[in-house]
Curated annotation (Swiss-Prot):
<dbReference type="Pfam" id="PF02310">
    <property type="entry name" value="B12-binding"/>
</dbReference>
<dbReference type="InterPro" id="IPR036594">
    <property type="entry name" value="Meth_synthase_dom"/>
</dbReference>
<dbReference type="InterPro" id="IPR003759">
    <property type="entry name" value="Cbl-bd_cap"/>
</dbReference>
<dbReference type="Pfam" id="PF02607">
    <property type="entry name" value="B12-binding_2"/>
</dbReference>
<dbReference type="GO" id="GO:0005829">
    <property type="term" value="C:cytosol"/>
</dbReference>
<keyword id="KW-0484">Methanogenesis</keyword>
<comment type="subunit">
    <text>Can form a complex with MtmB.</text>
</comment>
<keyword id="KW-0479">Metal-binding</keyword>
<dbReference type="InterPro" id="IPR036724">
    <property type="entry name" value="Cobalamin-bd_sf"/>
</dbReference>
<dbReference type="GO" id="GO:0008705">
    <property type="term" value="F:methionine synthase activity"/>
</dbReference>
<feature type="binding site" description="axial binding residue">
    <location>
        <position position="107"/>
    </location>
    <ligand>
        <name>methylcob(III)alamin</name>
    </ligand>
</feature>
<dbReference type="GO" id="GO:0031419">
    <property type="term" value="F:cobalamin binding"/>
</dbReference>
<comment type="similarity">
    <text>Belongs to the methylamine corrinoid protein family.</text>
</comment>
<feature type="domain" description="B12-binding N-terminal">
    <location>
        <begin position="1"/>
        <end position="91"/>
    </location>
</feature>
<dbReference type="GO" id="GO:0050667">
    <property type="term" value="P:homocysteine metabolic process"/>
</dbReference>
<dbReference type="GO" id="GO:0050897">
    <property type="term" value="F:cobalt ion binding"/>
</dbReference>
<dbReference type="InterPro" id="IPR012741">
    <property type="entry name" value="Corrinoid_p"/>
</dbReference>
Length: 218
């Protein structure tokens, strides 16, 4: 198979919730000399984008999301050790990434991928998990005031995305906004939304998220 064929098959494995097939293809891609980063950005992430768009359009529902998540996890179990081997040591003081999925949202597929990529690019990680209250994010940021921090929030649903605006408002109320950078992602998040709520950045996929985060923290 050509690399393009492998990437297309990986994308399809995510979309069709083929857990065993996704793991097998991931190993085959590594054996063919394809980098973990390319496997993620050109094979797995496009599949997750399709899944996110289908969920937003109500074409699929939670069970399918969960199964696609398991397919992604089967791939990441293979890729994470490889990413660790090639971990980029960030410049001194790259910073701490506090990652979380918005309150009311338990879809952690993209979140886990972004967290992995941030760690692989030199960030220290504090992963708060899924269905995280804005109050919890505020508390964790306040504890570390004075450190270099970027908040990285995910939301797959429009309803949970709206909580990002509340978080930005709370950061300003608590005089924490100037202490942290804020990046949000997920299927419904757009550049227009980021501008509207006064956040710093968004990204199309996990690999881009790591690059954007590094740029924002300069």
């Amino acid at each position: 198979m050509t690399n393009t064929e492998i990437f297309n098959k990986l994308t399809n494995a995510i979309v069709t919730q083929d857990i065993a097939g996704c793991a097998k293809l991931t190993q085959e891609a590594l054996d063919a000399g394809i980098s973990p980063l390319d496997i993620i950005t050109k094979g797995l992430s496009p599949g997750m984008k399709i899944i996110g768009d289908k969920f937003e359009a109500a074409e699929i529902f939670l069970p399918q999301i969960m199964m696609s998540g398991k397919a992604m996890s089967s791939a990441m179990e293979i890729l994470t050790p490889e990413l660790e081997k090639t971990k980029v040591e960030g410049e001194e003081g790259t910073g701490l990434a506090i990652t979380f999925v918005a309150e009311g949202d338990i879809h952690d597929i993209g979140h886990r991928l972004v967290t992995t990529m941030l760690g692989a690019n030199g960030f220290d990680i504090l992963d708060l998990g899924v269905d995280v209250l804005n109050e919890t994010v505020i508390e964790e940021a306040a504890k570390r005031k004075g450190q270099k921090i970027i908040l990285v929030g995910s939301a797959l649903m429009t309803t949970s995305m709206l909580g990002q605006k509340d978080l930005m408002d709370r950061l300003r109320e608590e005089n924490l906004r100037d202490s942290v950078k804020c990046m949000f992602g997920g299927a419904p998040v757009s550049d227009k939304w980021i501008d509207e709520i006064g956040a710093d950045a968004t990204a199309e996929n996990a690999a881009e998220a790591a690059k954007v985060a590094l740029n924002v923290m300069k």
